[in-house]
Each structure stands twice: as C-alpha cells, then as structure tokens.
Design a protein with these regions (language model features):
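Hydrophobic packing residues within well-ordered alpha-helices of enzyme cores
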Residues: 9, 50-54, 76, 104, ...
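N-terminal nucleotide-binding beta1-loop-alpha1 segment
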Residues: 1-12
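Conserved core of the sugar-phosphate nucleotidyltransferase
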Residues: 96-180, 187
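C-terminal catalytic/acceptor-binding lobe
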Residues: 183-196
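Short aromatic-hydrophobic micro-motifs that form the base-stacking/packing surface
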Residues: 87-89
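Short glycine-enriched, charge-decorated loop/helix-capping segments at active-site entrances
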Residues: 13-18
C-alpha cells in the first residue's frame, strides 16, 4: 500500500524515503518477493514519483483513487478480481523481512480464519520511541497493529472473522510515520544490526 500522501514525515513521498540508501517501499517489496509472493503495489495520484519508480523497477501497480488505506485496498480487490488470501502491508515498514512474512503466512494458515492481523506488544513501540496510533489487548497484552494483514479477497464484500496475531518482533514496531520514527529506526539498525 503506497498511495497515501505521508505528509507527517515531511520528507517527500514517503514510500521513496531512503533507509541506508534504499527506499522504504523497496524493502517491503523485496521482502514479499523473497517470501515467494506476487506483488501489486497500490498507488494513487498523490504519489506520482512513486508510480514512476515502480514502473522503473518493473513492479506491477494499481492506481487507486487515493481515498484512504481501506478504501483503496478494497477498490483494488474489486477492480482486479483478486481471489483467495491477500496480504496488505503499509509501505513504511522497512524492518519487514521474507522470514517474517513466511512465518505470518504459516500462522495464518494454521488458524483457519479468513482475516488475520499482526500486532506487536505496545512496549516495543515505547522502547522504540515511536508513538502507536492504536492500542488494544491481544492475548492479554497491550498491543499495537503494525500494518500487516491478510484477508480472503473472495469474501471482500463480507465481514470476515479475524485472528489477531501477537508477534514478538521488535523490528515491526517501526512503522515510520514521522521524523521521530524515522530517526528511531536508524538507531535500531545501528544497535541491532539488521543488515539493511
């Protein structure tokens, strides 16, 4: 998902903001490709440079209306006739890896529910110096969604029973929405040597 304006970060089009010399969107795209997924990047009129970058990289795109995250996702599902399990992921999650995606999908398959969301403990956000947008108890733990989900596209027009997965992966707490988040993630890379 790369169609939002990303105005809070104030560093140009957010998907193209570079971490260690590479756009954040590229980390996300390469992680999904590395996990064996076909990717379709949802863009909009709000991110013309991102659309051009995707074209240059050879990534397939869908140009949505730019109304909002959920609206653009479901517009894409309807217009492209996607079926079966579909990942959605924010473009500003540079700590994501192919191994994380593979583990998430295996857990999704084991739970037997059509919808699946990934959460990490709130304490990870606090330790990271990032501000969570939403907190709810998951498995008796205050937790925050990370922007990585799976839905059954075949049931896109229906309410879907959701499994909330508490995933203890600190790197997923870095959903880069503002300069403070960005700076915190750079420090995390240095401290934990993710190899980005």
């Amino acid at each position: 998902m790369a169609g939002g304006a990303g105005s809070r970060l104030d560093m140009g089009e957010k998907p193209l903001v570079k971490v260690s010399g590479k756009p954040m969107l590229q980390y996300v795209a390469e992680a999904f490709i590395g996990a064996g997924c076909d990717i379709l990047i949802i863009t909009s009129h709000l991110v013309p440079m991102t659309k051009n970058w995707c074209r240059a990289m050879g990534y397939d795109t869908y140009n949505a209306s730019g109304t909002g995250y959920v609206e653009d996702l479901f517009e894409c599902i309807r217009e492209t006739s996607l079926k079966g399990p579909v990942f959605s992921c924010v473009s500003d999650l540079p700590g994501i890896t192919a191994d994380i995606i593979s583990e998430v999908f295996e857990t999704y398959r084991s739970k037997g529910k059509p919808a699946f969301s990934v959460w990490v403990p709130e304490e990870y956000f606090i330790e990271a110096g990032c501000t969570p947008s939403y907190v709810e108890d998951v498995e008796s733990c205050p937790a925050c969604p990370v922007g990585l989900n799976i839905i059954d596209a075949s049931m896109a027009d229906d309410a879907q029973d959701e499994y909330r997965f508490l995933f203890r992966k600190p790197e997923l707490a870095y959903n880069v929405n503002c300069k403070k988040d960005f700076e915190s993630f750079l420090k995390f890379i240095e401290r934990d040597k993710l190899g980005l």
